[in-house]
C-alpha cells in the first residue's frame, strides 16, 4: 500500500513495460473497458472469466468524482455505538467520502448489469460481488482495516445466477472465506473441484 495509489492506479497491456493510467476516475474507466469487452461476447462460442477489481472506496476518501461528493457534503450519518465520542466528527467526514465512492461504484455495477442484459448474457453469467475487507471508519477508535474486528473482516458475498438460485434468490448464514470462492464457482459450473484445493464448495447451499 506504500507504493500503490488505489484511487489512481496504473496498469500494463500485454508484455509492454509502459505504465498506463485510466483517463478518469478508475472505477468508471475500468467499467467502460469491461463493457467494451462484453460487447464481444454475445456470440462467442467459448465461456469467459473476467475480474473487475475496483480499488475504491479506499483512503483517502475525498477522491470520488465531484458530483458524488456533493451528494453527501452536508449529510449526517448514524454513527456506530463503538465509535468514541472524540472520533465522531472524524468518522462523519470519512463516511461522506466513503459513501460518495460507494454511490459511484453502485452506478458502475448498474452499467455493467445493463450491458450484460443488452448482450443477452445476464441469465447465463455467474456474477460475484465481494470485497477483500471492510474499514473500521472510527469503530473502536480505529480507521482502516488492520485490526480483525467484524467491521474489517465481515464483507458481502453476493452471487447472481438464476440457473442455480432461481429468480428470487436464496440467503445463507454460512461462513464463507476467500479460499472457498474458486471451488464454489467450479461447483456452480459443474466442474470437479481438485482434491488439492483448500477451500470448500458452497454451491449446494
Residue ranges and their predicted role:
Residues 183:
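Glycine-rich, aromatic-lined ligand/substrate-binding cores of catalytic
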Residues 197-205:
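Short, intrinsically disordered, charge-balanced linker/junction segments flanking boundaries
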Residues 2-29, 35-175, 179, 187-197:
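Active-site-proximal cap/lid insertion segments
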Amino acid at each position: 500500500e506504500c507504493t500503490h495509489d488505489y484511487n489512481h492506479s496504473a496498469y500494463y497491456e500485454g508484455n509492454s513495460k509502459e505504465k498506463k493510467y485510466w483517463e478518469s476516475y478508475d472505477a468508471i474507466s475500468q467499467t467502460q473497458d469491461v463493457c467494451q469487452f462484453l460487447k464481444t461476447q454475445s456470440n462467442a462460442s467459448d465461456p469467459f472469466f473476467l475480474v473487475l477489481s475496483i480499488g475504491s472506496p479506499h483512503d483517502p476518501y475525498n477522491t470520488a468524482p465531484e458530483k458524488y461528493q456533493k451528494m453527501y457534503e452536508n449529510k449526517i450519518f448514524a454513527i456506530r455505538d463503538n465509535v468514541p465520542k472524540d472520533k465522531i466528527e472524524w468518522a462523519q467526514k470519512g463516511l461522506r467520502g466513503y459513501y460518495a465512492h460507494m454511490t459511484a461504484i453502485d452506478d458502475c455495477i448498474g452499467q455493467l448489469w445493463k450491458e450484460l442484459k443488452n448482450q443477452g448474457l445476464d441469465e447465463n453469467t455467474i456474477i460475484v460481488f465481494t470485497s477483500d475487507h471492510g474499514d473500521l471508519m472510527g469503530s473502536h477508535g480505529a480507521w482502516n482495516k488492520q485490526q480483525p474486528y467484524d467491521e474489517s473482516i465481515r464483507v458481502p458475498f453476493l452471487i447472481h445466477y438464476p440457473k442455480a438460485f432461481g429468480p428470487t434468490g436464496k440467503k445463507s448464514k454460512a461462513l464463507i472465506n476467500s479460499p472457498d470462492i474458486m471451488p464454489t464457482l467450479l461447483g456452480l459450473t459443474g466442474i470437479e473441484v481438485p482434491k488439492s484445493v483448500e477451500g470448500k464448495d458452497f454451491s449446494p447451499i
